[in-house]
């Protein structure tokens, strides 16, 4: 949603990284946490001594949450409100700079708004945390972010490279689609070895991540692969490699946010955004349970927000019923 707004409103965005974030949190007042004495310091303490932690440390389960609670306090001091829809999204309506948004991903903070507003917010944030300023957002959470011709484009070249580095993938330059049209994967009795199953699960997981962030068109193929995470065979492994080959052969593609309309930043409070949604369904694609597959996508002024492909939880008795379930 924020990337779509960046494209529609032409927001400026920077990325900052909080140094030593998990060392900054405070423990609850009624909680005492202890740790073993590090080996290099054991000679300075009595046997069986332990150290009481005054601050959170890396490795403690509570560290991430305690930093998030600290971040909440800082956001409140900076007059940012937390979104009710997302606990890691903060926003502020400023009289001078208009709408400003901060997105937190653990210790990575993205600041969005006008250039002047973003710079002012960044300077104020640096008063609370010791941060690394990585400049204008070019990459975020493993995604390469490109701006061109009024649009934003997300790609994941590093993840694509891992397909050839981590898997025994035989490149096939002829593959131009993620799956053979109309094909369906079936259960098999000749299942993969435990080692190959680990490879299959790892590869399918990477494809799921790729599908979510930058390649929504492989959603239906990845859904098919995900059905056999506990009992895949050689046909399923070949299908997974086919999707990988398709992604490598079309590495220039990605998720593009190209709005059909644009809005000036100062008019965002009165701009009427248009949300479109589309759904579709096949009929009885699963030959065993006769289940149908639903697909849908939603757009904000032409910028894709969400896509999904899933098997329906019930058995539809007609094409019409399958279409209604998809809606």
Short names for language-model regions:
Residues 1-327:
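Long, low-complexity, charge-biased intrinsically disordered regions
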